[in-house]
């Protein structure tokens, strides 16, 4: 027994003691820990190492994503593009590219849009280049050996939801493809876009960012200049996100006003683009989840149980209808896993009697 806190005692069992006599009522949920247990170098740290330090994509990830350790929780980190850093580069780009006022005879729309696109290069890299790099990396993954530590434990007649993009359930254990739902995509399907992204409510992320920055001196309506005189704030981030009345903004010019607002559109489009479309995935697989009504036990192997995937687990529970009757067997590796499982149980409303832990 392992005590996670004073309220929870989570029972540990040996893998061979898990009753798997009725595979037709058993659902396996497979996460990245499954691949890693088979020697697949599929951690996000390995993905980072596959990208050259000089690559603009890696520079963008490590400099324009405002997280201390983006690789520790990579998909979650994608929700934290640094708005301020992107907006602060706008004036320099407009100046370097020599963008003229819109009423100037030599004004070039191409120069204007070229400048704003230059500022939004991080957005392009994250929405266009990142999925391509990620897929190429995924396509190269393979087990390091022929070991099959779960031989006999994985039942071919059971149901499987695979959160990985790889087919090792099939190739290593002979699980029929038709028994597996590749919930985030199958790397062998070239027409299928792999699901990658954060699961945050983008409006909530914005509110938190706005709330934590609104009182900073940099984002106040009046600022003190070098000579001690006050002036109306002309900072692009302030004008874009904190100014309450556009008509009172120190935009300096119509061209700059348009450039700031166009850049904001590109940045905010990123947040929607980078979100994991969980609802769409659920709708697309509605009939599959409806077919899980007979499932009585769920075996979770190598899944982080992060909140981004909560909707899928709630759908599993919903399909069963009788939450207290469902048994859960969840693999764990470290004390951090135990804490995550504890939080997951509380979010899902699972009783400690329903959940047992085992090691892979």
Model segments located where?
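SIR2/sirtuin-family catalytic core signature
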Residues: 2-38, 272, 280-360
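Extended, H/D-rich, highly charged conserved domains that either
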Residues: 60-265
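Phosphate/oxyanion-binding active-site loops and adjacent basic polyanion-contact surfaces
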Residues: 40, 47, 57, 130, ...
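Alpha-helix-centered segments that form part of catalytic cores
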Residues: 139-140, 146, 265-286
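Extended charged low-complexity segments that act as oligomerization/scaffolding linkers
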Residues: 25, 43-83, 273, 349-360
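Short secondary-structure boundary/capping segments
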Residues: 41-51, 175-179, 315-316, 345-346
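Short N-terminal helix/helix-N-cap motif within the alpha/beta-hydrolase-1
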Residues: 38-39, 170
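Terminal, non-catalytic protein-protein interaction segments that mediate quaternary/complex assembly
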Residues: 11-20, 24-34, 43, 50, ...
